[in-house]
């Protein structure tokens, strides 16, 4: 397959087998075009590097929540990293497997936690002790268990801009490296 999805044939541009001119006539300009073939090829190429290793590639829904894109990825075995109940609902409507959904982010509401537990998602990425206690409380009220992972700040400086820094002891996301055991005991 060619590296570009835009192909010039007889003086006319095509994306896959569709003439760009007809797309402009039908949709106007500007517009977004995604190549299903290219998306699948790239996803499978990336996935092939993990052959023989138990893994799950999770697409960050916040990067593109287009239902068609999510559906293509779901059909090809992708998992999903979500940060809201709305993203969870989009993945479910795109036929994504809830058992392949990881719920990240610091702003999870009680309703979003309840929705995710009721859909039996793979795991919550926990960012703080207080969030862990909220998830535990909601799960208990539903008489269910919630799987978690804990985002640990290893106190490593990646030398990025201070406003986007993560991984340091004083960063707002995640727990410090001495806290996970205390959180788990709760």
Segments predicted by a language model, with ranges:
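Conserved anion-binding
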Residues: 119, 128-186
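A charged N-terminal "starter" segment
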Residues: 1-146
């Amino acid at each position: 397959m060619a590296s570009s999805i835009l192909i010039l044939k007889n003086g006319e541009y095509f994306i896959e087998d569709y003439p760009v001119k007809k797309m402009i006539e039908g949709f106007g300009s500007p517009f977004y075009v995604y190549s299903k073939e290219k998306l699948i090829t790239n996803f499978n190429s990336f996935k092939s590097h993990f052959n023989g290793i138990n893994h799950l590639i999770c697409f960050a829904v916040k990067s593109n929540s287009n239902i068609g894109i999510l559906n293509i990825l779901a059909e090809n075995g992708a998992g999903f990293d979500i940060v809201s109940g709305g993203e969870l609902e989009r993945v479910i409507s795109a036929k994504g497997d809830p058992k392949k959904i990881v719920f990240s982010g610091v702003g999870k509401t009680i309703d979003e936690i309840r929705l995710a537990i009721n859909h039996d998602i793979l795991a919550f990425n926990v960012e703080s002790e207080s969030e862990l206690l909220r998830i535990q409380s909601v799960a208990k009220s539903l008489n269910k268990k919630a799987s978690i992972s804990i985002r640990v700040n290893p106190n490593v400086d990646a030398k990025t801009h201070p406003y986007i820094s993560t991984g340091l002891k004083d960063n707002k996301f995640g727990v410090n490296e001495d806290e996970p055991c205390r959180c788990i005991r709760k």
